Amino acid sequence: MTKPVCVVVGIGPQNGASFARRFASEGYAIALLSRKTEYSSNLAAEIDSAKVYACDVTVPSAIETAFAAVRADMGEIDVLVYNAGSGVWGNIEELSAHDFEQSWRINTMGAFLVSKEVIPSMKKKKTGSIIFIGATASLRGKPFTTAFAPAKASQRSLAQAMARQLWPSGIHVSLIIIDGGVKSLDSDANVEAPETLDPDDIATTAYFLSQQPRSAWSFEVDVRPSQESW
C-alpha cells in the first residue's frame, strides 16, 4: 500500500525534526526540504520513510526542482508543513533593505511558492492539508522584530487568503502560532523548563490539524506553555 506523503519544509533539531518524526510515526513518507542538508541527512538515517531534498525557498527554480523530485520519488503530496523561517533581528536603524526583504522572502514568498507546488494535485483529489508555522510576531511586533514581524504577519495574511479560497476545494489551510520559546530535543539544558514548548507537542497539534473532520476545521491555533504569561 502506498504511503501518504508529508513534506516538511525547514528542518532543524526543534520543530522540523518533530514534525517529521510525528508524521512518520503515523505512516507517512516524509520529504525533508531544507537549504542545508547535513542535519536532514542525519534525521533521515533515523526515519526509514524519509528522504532529503536540498531546497532554498528564496529561489523559485530550486523549489520547482525539489518538488518535482519529491513527486517522482514518493507521489503526490498529502500534507505540507511550512516551517521555514528567518530570524532576522534588529531595530530599524540597524537593518538593511536586504535584511528586510530576505526575511519576507523566506517567511512569506517561500510559503507562497511551495503552496503552489501542492495545490493542483490537492484540488484534483479534493483533499489535502497545508500548515504554516507562525510565531508571536505573526500577531504583533516587538522591539528588534522590525524585519521578522512584518514577514510573519504577511505569512498569516497569505494563509488567511488561501484558506478562504481553498477550503471549498477540500484543502485545509491552517496556521499554528507558536507563542513562546521552543526547547531543543538535542539538548538536555532546558528539558525541565516549564516555560518552553516541547516541539513534539507542537507536532501533535500539527498532526491533529491534518486530521480534523471537515465539519469542524480550525484555521488558527495558538500554542503556548501553561506557564506562559499572555
Model-derived segments and spans:
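Conserved glycine-rich cofactor-binding loop
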Residues: 12-14
